[in-house]
């Protein structure tokens, strides 16, 4: 085996030969088009890293038993994916060194190509757990998969990648929720124990609302303002109970509601009693999941603002509504909605209900779930 050089190991020669544009001739590519190509190639490499880290975290949570030290490894992978998204955000600044006129000089050569055809970005969405019925149509009435097809309707290599990802296995969300449903709530996984904890917590939520209302009264707020707060707190209390007891969907069967209660109770339990040793890493995992989704939402928003700054609100090269579509994805593409909702229900430490089996969450060698 010959000695390895940096140039050969990184395959720089091959990388530097990939900026030839539509005709494969780099001599015909101007500096602005070269910038466009390189930045998007770098994005695809970042997406590859994110997919690797998310797959690792998903596979870890897919195990029947997840040892505590492995949760730390999952957190590390999620934090790396977060760091990659944050770094990718900086690349939009490089793109913004290109003016609208610069881009328009070569934009028509891209048609009907579109960033929407990034199979790896679609893979990230699928791996996270974005459902088909939650997607925004890229064109009038069209499936996101239609945009990945070749002009003649045949499947492209990008379409095959997405199909393979869908067939490969469960999403990170599915595995996370399955893992959460196994976390003992106050020492027990029994549905009755879960419901008892939730009832106790709902009682604490209502007591906290009453305390806040009394504070408003004591500070001599105007009667109309007090009544407005009273109505708001009552609505919040009803919403909290409906969510925690999984009663928001009257069509859901008893088993579905039971599973939702277990997951939501676990989210609330881990966040509320995070000082307990065995809940420390689970809490870091949930925090990392939220930060991951936040970093992707920020990336989507930054992407939309970069596009708007350069070309305004033109129709996209692939026929989409352009910036309007990008803005909608930034607003509506939320995967871990229950985690975000739980943040609205957290109480200060002195207000959370006491638990009976706190000692069972002390340091131990065995896995929590």
Swiss-Prot record:
GO terms for molecular function: heme binding; metal ion binding; tryptophan 2,3-dioxygenase activity. It catalyses: L-tryptophan + O2 = N-formyl-L-kynurenine. It is an enzyme of class 1 (oxidoreductase). Binds 1 heme group per subunit. Heme binds at residue 303. The keyword Signal does not apply. Substrate binds at residues 36-40, 107, 317. Pathway: Amino-acid degradation; L-tryptophan degradation via kynurenine pathway; L-kynurenine from L-tryptophan: step 1/2. Keywords: Dioxygenase, Heme, Iron, Metal-binding, Oxidoreductase, Plasmid, Tryptophan catabolism. Its EC number is 1.13.11.11. InterPro entries: Trp/Indoleamine_2_3_dOase-like (IPR037217), Trp_2_3_dOase (IPR004981). Its cofactor is heme. One of its GO terms (biological process) is L-tryptophan catabolic process to kynurenine. SUPFAM superfamilies: Indolic compounds 2,3-dioxygenase-like. Belongs to the tryptophan 2,3-dioxygenase family. Homotetramer. Heme-dependent dioxygenase that catalyzes the oxidative cleavage of the L-tryptophan (L-Trp) pyrrole ring and converts L-tryptophan to N-formyl-L-kynurenine. Catalyzes the oxidative cleavage of the indole moiety. This is Tryptophan 2,3-dioxygenase 2.
């Amino acid at each position: 085996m010959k000695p390895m050089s940096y140039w050969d190991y990184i395959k720089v020669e091959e990388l530097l030969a990939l900026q030839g544009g539509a005709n494969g001739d780099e001599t015909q590519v101007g500096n602005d088009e070269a910038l466009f190509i390189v930045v998007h190639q770098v994005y695809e490499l970042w997406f590859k890293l994110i997919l690797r880290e998310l797959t690792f975290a998903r596979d870890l949570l897919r195990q029947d038993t997840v040892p505590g030290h492995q949760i730390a490894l999952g957190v590390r992978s999620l934090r790396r994916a977060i760091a990659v998204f944050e770094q990718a955000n900086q690349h939009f600044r490089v793109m913004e060194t290109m003016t609208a006129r610069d881009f328009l000089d070569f934009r028509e050569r891209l048609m009907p190509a579109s960033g929407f055809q990034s199979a790896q970005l679609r893979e990230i969405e699928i791996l996270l757990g974005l459902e088909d019925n939650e997607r925004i149509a890229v064109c009038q009435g069209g499936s996101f998969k239609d945009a990945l097809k070749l002009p003649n309707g045949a499947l492209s290599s990008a379409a095959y990648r997405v199909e393979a990802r869908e067939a490969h296995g469960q999403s990170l969300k599915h595995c996370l929720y399955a893992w959460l449903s196994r976390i003992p709530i106050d020492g027990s996984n029994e549905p009755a124990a879960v419901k008892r904890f939730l009832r106790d917590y709902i009682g604490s939520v209502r007591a906290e609302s009453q305390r806040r209302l009394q504070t408003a009264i004591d500070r001599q707020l105007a009667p109309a303002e007090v009544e407005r707060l009273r109505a708001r707190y009552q609505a919040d209390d009803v919403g909290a109970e409906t969510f925690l007891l999984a009663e928001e969907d009257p069509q859901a069967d008893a088993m579905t509601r039971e599973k939702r209660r277990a997951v939501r109770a676990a989210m609330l339990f881990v966040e509320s009693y995070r000082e307990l040793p065995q809940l420390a890493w689970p809490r870091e995992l949930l925090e990392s999941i939220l930060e991951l989704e936040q970093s992707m939402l920020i990336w989507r928003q930054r992407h939309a603002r970069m596009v708007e700054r350069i070309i305004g609100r033109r129709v996209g090269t692939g026929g989409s509504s352009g910036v309007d579509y990008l803005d909608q994805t930034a607003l509506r593409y939320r995967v871990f909605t229950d985690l975000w909702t739980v943040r609205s229900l957290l109480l200060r430490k002195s207000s959370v209900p006491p638990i009976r089996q706190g000692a069972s969450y002390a340091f131990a060698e065995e896995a929590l779930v």
